[in-house]
Amino acid sequence: MITEPRWKSYIVETTTPIFTPKQCQMIINAGRNEPKKNAEVGSSQGIKGGVYDTKTRTSHISWIPFKKMSYMYKDIERIMKTTNGNHFGFDGMTITEMAQYTEYPEGGFYDWHTDNDVDMRHEPPVRKISMT
């Protein structure tokens, strides 16, 4: 008998938009108004150590500060807490990382990857729930 992998029960998706088109445009504007840089591989929210690797990733990123888009973070945290309560039950869930805004040029991409620090030079955040 073939069964679904156990981890698939941990995947939750929303089919109802969290933000209106107007709110999405405000988020886009906020991301575009922050300092933009070529995305690197192997770096974390401004921590040095990443490399520019066009074989793995071709995009531009910026970080949206909590204070500039507090309503966005409140909405995301509300959905995160509801999802956590309905499916996982972790204690003390809160958003600890700024949202990364990414733009891809024509032909841009980000190849398959995991978010971790393989050399463990920096203690990575514990991500119990990731939202895209």
Where are these predicted regions, by residue range?
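Fe(II)/2-oxoglutarate oxygenase catalytic core
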Residues: 1-130
